[in-house]
Amino acid sequence: GLPVCGETCVGGTCNTPGCSCSWPVCTRN
């Protein structure tokens, strides 16, 4: 739930394990 993945997901996907896309950034649940 916290935006600590340091990754963006403008394309709709996150590469960081345990992270999901909350456009336009990846968040960790």
From Swiss-Prot:
It comes from the Eukaryota. GO terms for biological process: defense response. Disulfide bonds join 5-19, 9-21, 14-26. This is a cyclic peptide. Keywords: Disulfide bond, Knottin, Plant defense. There is a cross-link at residues 1-29 (Cyclopeptide (Gly-Asn)). InterPro entries: Cyclotide, Cyclotide_moebius_CS, Cyclotide_sf. The keyword Phosphoprotein does not apply. Probably participates in a plant defense mechanism. Has cytotoxic activity against a variety of drug-resistant and drug-sensitive human tumor cell lines, and against primary chronic lymphocytic leukemia cells. Has weak cytotoxic activity against primary ovarian carcinoma cells or normal lymphocytes. Belongs to the cyclotide family. Moebius subfamily. The presence of a 'disulfide through disulfide knot' structurally defines this protein as a knottin. This is Varv peptide A. The lineage of its organism: Eukaryota, Viridiplantae, Streptophyta, Embryophyta, Tracheophyta.
